[in-house]
Swiss-Prot record:
Location in the cell: Cell inner membrane
Organism: Haemophilus influenzae (strain ATCC 51907 / DSM 11121 / KW20 / Rd)
TM regions (residue ranges): 7-26
Membrane disposition: Single-pass membrane protein
GO biological process: Gram-negative-bacterium-type cell outer membrane assembly; lipopolysaccharide transport
Name assigned to this protein: Lipopolysaccharide export system protein LptC
Pfam families, per the entry: LptC
Domain of life the protein comes from: Bacteria
Family: Belongs to the LptC family.
InterPro entries hit by this protein: LipoPS_assembly_LptC-rel, LPS_export_LptC, LptC
Annotated Gene Ontology cellular component terms: outer membrane-bounded periplasmic space; plasma membrane
Organism taxonomic ancestry: Bacteria, Pseudomonadati, Pseudomonadota, Gammaproteobacteria, Pasteurellales
C-alpha cells in the first residue's frame, strides 16, 4: 500500500511539473509572437497616416504645392511616399506679369494662388519630387482665361519642381475653344503648354455670334 501511494504521489508531482513546463513554453511562444509583431517587416512602411494635408515650400519660401490624401505610406529605405486618392494643388513659382498684375488689382497674392489641381486614384512621390500618378488622372487648371484648361489620362508623371508633365497613355486635353486626343503627352503646366504625339486628333469649337 505504501508503495502504491508513493507511485501516485510521484505521478501527481510529475503531472504538475509537466503542466508548469507546458504553461511556461506557451507563455514563451506568446512573448515571441508579440515581439515579432513589434519588429517592422522589410517591405512595410515606416509611417502611415490618414486624411493627411501637407504644404511644401520652395527654397525661397514660396508655396510649391499642397498635397491632400486619404492615406499616405512613407518608406525611408527608398525615400518614397505612396498616396491613396491624392489631391495635389500646384502654385506658380515664377511670375507671369499679366496674371500677376491682374491679381494685384484684385488684392490677391500671385504666389499664394493655386494654379493647377492634380487628382488620381493612386500616386507615388520620390525624393526628387517626381510624382507618378495612376488611374483616372486629371490635371485641372484653376486660373481664369487659361489656354490649357484640362488634361485627362490614365497615367502621368509630374515634376513638382518644374511642373513638367509627361504621359505614355492615351491623353485628352481641353483648351480654350478646342479639345485634342493623342497617345502620348509632353508639356509644362506652369507654361500651359501640352504637345500630343501619335494619332493626334483636334476638334475646334466654333463660337456662335
Amino acid at each position: 500500500m505504501i508503495e502504491i501511494k508513493m507511485n501516485i504521489r510521484w505521478n501527481v508531482i510529475l503531472g504538475v511539473i509537466a503542466l508548469c513546463a507546458l504553461a511556461w513554453f506557451y507563455s514563451l511562444n506568446q512573448e515571441t509572437a508579440d515581439l515579432s509583431e513589434l519588429v517592422k517587416k522589410p517591405d512595410s512602411p515606416d509611417y502611415v497616416g490618414y486624411k493627411m494635408e501637407t504644404t511644401v515650400f520652395s527654397p525661397d519660401g514660396k508655396k510649391q504645392y499642397l498635397a491632400l490624401s486619404d492615406k499616405i505610406e512613407h518608406y525611408t529605405v527608398n525615400e518614397q511616399t505612396l498616396f491613396t486618392a491624392p489631391l495635389v494643388y500646384l502654385y506658380p513659382t515664377t511670375s507671369n506679369e499679366k496674371e500677376k498684375e491682374k491679381n494685384a488689382n484684385q488684392n490677391v497674392d500671385f504666389f499664394s494662388t493655386q494654379s493647377w489641381k492634380l487628382s488620381a486614384n493612386q500616386a507615388r512621390l520620390t525624393k526628387d519630387q517626381i510624382l507618378y500618378l495612376e488611374g483616372n488622372v486629371v490635371a485641372q487648371n484653376l486660373t481664369s482665361d487659361s489656354r490649357l484648361q484640362r488634361i485627362e489620362t490614365e497615367s502621368a508623371v509630374v515634376n513638382l519642381k518644374t511642373q513638367d508633365i509627361t504621359s505614355e497613355t492615351q491623353v485628352k486635353i481641353k483648351g480654350k475653344n478646342f479639345s485634342s486626343t493623342g497617345l502620348k503627352l509632353v508639356g509644362n503646366l506652369r507654361q500651359q503648354v501640352a504637345t500630343l504625339k501619335e494619332q493626334v486628333k483636334t476638334y475646334y469649337e466654333v463660337s456662335k455670334q
